[in-house]
Amino acid sequence: MPVSRYAVFGHPVAHSLSPAIHADFGKQTGIALDYTAIDAAPEEFTAALERFAADGGKGANVTLPLKEAAFALSASPSDRARVAGAVNTLVRNDGQWQGDNTDGAGLVRDLTERHGLDLRGRRVLLLGAGGAARGVAPALLEAGITEMVVVNRSPERADALCDALGEPGRVVSRYLEDLRELGDFELIVNATAAGRDRDAGAFALPLGLVNSLTAAVDLNYGATAIAFLAWARSAQCRYAIDGLGMLVEQAAESFALWHGVRPQTDPVYDALRARDAVLVSAD
């Protein structure tokens, strides 16, 4: 019986832990699969995906900077992908790609089940308005937060995300210059790539954003998350959480879409956490 082919597309993507995660899920569930990493620059993505499909590809994950391009290539995106305008999971069906976004479900599951956070009634600051932010924002709203403030270097992108979410009473955009005037938040989510340069000054955020309950969450992990988590600890946030748990949980959601069974995530998370020193970024 031929082994089904899966892959993660990104640029760069050689560092991705997704092949190892899905290999572990396959062993755990007894499902034989071939999962590889495929580097594709944005201008090469469409052709690379077509070649993958022609070679028998059944499903794919998509990471930076291709999530919005994957949405455009999806014949029938899911509701949550449509709201996000970004796709991180592709399923091949009847010769077409169906797009979904499991990032938000992965984040919420990690925060609520692994870390025991209750998101209901919380005020959230979302840093960033790109594909990563778009992927998690709808799920945070569904989890019961009361207000989301979106801040992005490009105000136009923040406005576009708020418009796409369609909840003007709960979601607003603000300028970076206004951070000192926004009050405090129970959840601060970094959905930017600012930490990739490992610049300790990249997150010189006002301490007034923090209260006694604040959880600071970086959607990246490992070296990429160091700068933001260092700020979170210096600001005395109650929780400083990286994106490793989200990575594993969103991968399990993707695996379930492809194979009809959701694997156990704690063993994989624990094994990866033990390898913490070699982790690079959340994809």
From Swiss-Prot:
Residues that coordinate or bind shikimate: S16, L17, S18, T63, N88, D103
Pathway: Metabolic intermediate biosynthesis; chorismate biosynthesis; chorismate from D-erythrose 4-phosphate and phosphoenolpyruvate: step 4/7
The organism's place on the tree of life at top rank: Bacteria
Biological process according to GO: amino acid biosynthetic process; aromatic amino acid family biosynthetic process; chorismate biosynthetic process; shikimate metabolic process
CDD domains (UniProt xref): NAD_bind_Shikimate_DH (cd01065)
Catalytic site: K67 (proton acceptor)
GO molecular function, one term: shikimate 3-dehydrogenase (NADP+) activity
Keyword set, alphabetical order: Amino-acid biosynthesis, Aromatic amino acid biosynthesis, NADP, Oxidoreductase
Major enzyme class: oxidoreductase
EC number: 1.1.1.25
GTP-binding among keywords: no
InterPro entries in UniProt: Aminoacid_DH-like_N_sf, NAD(P)-bd_dom_sf, SDH_C, Shikimate_DH, Shikimate_DH-bd_N, Shikimate_DH_fam, Shikm_DH/Glu-tRNA_Rdtase
GO CC term, one of those recorded: cytosol
Positions with a binding annotation for NADP(+): D79, G128, A129, G130, G131, A132, A223, G243
Catalytic reactions of this protein: shikimate + NADP(+) = 3-dehydroshikimate + NADPH + H(+)
Family, similarity comment: Belongs to the shikimate dehydrogenase family.
Assembly and oligomerization: Homodimer.
Function: Involved in the biosynthesis of the chorismate, which leads to the biosynthesis of aromatic amino acids. Catalyzes the reversible NADPH linked reduction of 3-dehydroshikimate (DHSA) to yield shikimate (SA).
Protein name: Shikimate dehydrogenase (NADP(+))
Protein species of origin: Xanthomonas campestris pv. campestris (strain B100)
Organism lineage string: Bacteria, Pseudomonadati, Pseudomonadota, Gammaproteobacteria, Lysobacterales
